[in-house]
Amino acid sequence: MNKITLGMLGGTPCTISDAAPNHSILITGISGSGKTCHLQRIELDAIQTKHLIIVLDTSHSHDVDRIYNPIRSDYEANCKRISVSQEGIDLRLFSSESSPSQQPNRIINDVTQMIASSSNLGKRQTKMLRKAVASAYTNYTPGKNALQLIGSNLINLGSDGEDLYDRLWYIFQNDAALSGGSTFEKGNINIIDFSDFDPDTQKIIAELVLKSIWNNKSSLLSGNQECLIILDECQRLYLGPNSMICQILREGRKFGLNVIMATQSLSIFSKPTISMLEQAGTKLYFQPSQSDLQRITKSLQQANQANWKQTLTHLRRGECVADGILQVGKSTIRRPLILP
């Protein structure tokens, strides 16, 4: 199995051990700690090990001028940039290769829940949305824009439907779900740019993209290839208990799907969300915020917590503490390591 290089120790790659519960990674650290530069190095290395890389960029973190300068040339030579608002992306909302004979009601319910959950819709609004999705499913043909079709159906449901349309109008006003839009390229870092959308729309479209990846994983991956989904500034995405991120963390490894989630601080999340994020088998802790320091120190589970607190406080830019089941050369390491 091709492994992801987390960093180098004395010239030897430090990777995630096959004994780890999954190959997902949680990265935390304050702004300026070097976590995004490190993340981009991991992405470029993963391309060399034949991973399919899909980046969901909600904050311009992967704009050309923000790629780590020492690797920028190689990085740009190996990436495909997709502007969702300008080019659209083929989401295949109404198809699922994992179950071609899937009952229409299942597909309709999945699409409805993806939009409703990430939009915090109530029961009445969800019921109305389901009617619009069902009608769109019935009338959909290849080449049509699935989201615009759903929006048109909402308008036809009367004043309440129009109100819901107005609430979600931006997702119906672009080619985000255009059949025949951009698709992912194997062998490249696929950067999906959501930065033109407002935060609420980002959550909805990103959730639909993740669902599409999940539903069509077999055609995306070949042989033992794995897909690595990059979620920088992951606090911008929908992280509820029924979210696709939660599902990938729970079940993704057996299908070759893993996520790398990066955020400045865990303290902004609720306890259930933190527990969900910490299902990632490997953590990379860059210089933490003061609000995270005590939590991370305790999570390292070492006898001398005072030393780890000091180590975390004095991490230099680009340095991190890796925690998980790691592999260095032929050795399996079950204790935290400092990666330069």
Task: Please place each PLM-identified region on the residue numbering.
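Short strand->helix junction
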Residues: 32-33, 199, 266
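Active/binding-pocket-proximal capping segment
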Residues: 227, 266, 279
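A short acidic, often aromatic-flanked loop/helix-cap motif at beta-alpha or helix-coil junctions
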Residues: 22-23, 86-91, 291-293
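Basic- and hydrophobic-enriched, low-structure N-terminal and domain-boundary segments
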Residues: 1-33, 37-44, 49, 91, ...
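H-loop/switch region of ABC-family ATPase nucleotide-binding domains
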Residues: 263
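P-loop NTPase motor domains
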Residues: 38-257, 270-272, 310-328
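P-loop NTPase motor core of the ASCE superfamily
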Residues: 14-16, 25, 47, 269-340
